């Protein structure tokens, strides 16, 4: 499983936002983007957020590669190459439960903060509970919180 890096800056705090708040923001703000950091099998078999009323396309970029869950060494570069940084204010990161996306948001925020021309102009935010949410008492996801549980638009291929 992907672990946090020892070289993370200690002074960066990643805020969290509930899925319904994130969707509302993405529906009205053209400077906000949703970045889904799950794996290709998760997108294909579990589903993915649907951009029905969102102002921008969803960015799909694997934080780690299935099945070994090794970190994508090009993750940050792939994300930044898909964005016009002059037009971004908020980047929302989502994964299955909110864990990987937190590390992904932290990693991108750290990189952005190192670039003086955009430092403190773009905020990386974690989608609390992720796409599927926490495990229920019977060890199943999607029954207590998360994007799908909140009734937000999603698709499955």
Regions flagged by a language model, labelled:
Residues 94:
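Short, surface-exposed ligand- or partner-binding patches at beta-edge/loop junctions that are enriched
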Residues 1-33, 40-90, 101-157:
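Rhodanese-like catalytic fold shared by cysteine-dependent sulfurtransferases
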Residues 98:
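Conserved G/P- and acidic residue-centered "switch" motifs that form tight phosphate/ATP-binding loops
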